[in-house]
Amino acid sequence: MIIYKNTNNYLDFTGFEAGVLVNPNYLFEFIKDDDGTKTYCIGVDISANKVKHNLCLIVEKNSPIFTNGEVYLLQGFYLVNIYEQANGSTNLDPTGLTKVETKKLRVIDTAMPTNKEYNGYTKTQNVYNG
């Protein structure tokens, strides 16, 4: 999974298979690979066919409201634990919740890298007339 900074992101997973609740909200636990920092947010499943896959909108922004599917993440790699909880819940603590999936995530900047073009090569062609 990939999250781009300062944009709306759709995270696709299969939480229905391991879940036990009907029409749950999902608690996302983001654990940064390099330092173990944990960040949480709640996502609402917006997929049309929840039996096949689940789709949650997660907005990456600087001043998030974690209970509205918003999160602030630094660039890098994360382990994401996804838990189900009762619809309408604003709980940001995974204790006692059912984990439905674990995924890897990369957070990257939305700015496109600058391509540098090299023009120092010879533009003449040598032809052998043998």
For each predicted feature, which ranges?
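Beta-strand-rich interaction surfaces with strong enrichment in secreted/lumenal proteins
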Residues: 1, 42-46, 68-69
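N-terminal "first-domain core" detector
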Residues: 1-37
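A structural detector for beta-sheet-dominated domains
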Residues: 14-16, 31, 60, 83, ...
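Short, aromatic- and glycine-rich surface loops/edge beta-strands on solvent-exposed regions
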Residues: 26-29, 72-88
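Short, surface-exposed beta-strand/loop "edge" segments at domain boundaries and coil↔beta transitions
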Residues: 35-39, 64-66, 87-92
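Solvent-exposed serine/threonine-rich low-complexity stretches and specific carbohydrate-binding patches
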Residues: 37-53
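Signal that preferentially marks extracellular ectodomain short beta-strand elements
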Residues: 55-75
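Short beta-strand elements
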Residues: 86-130
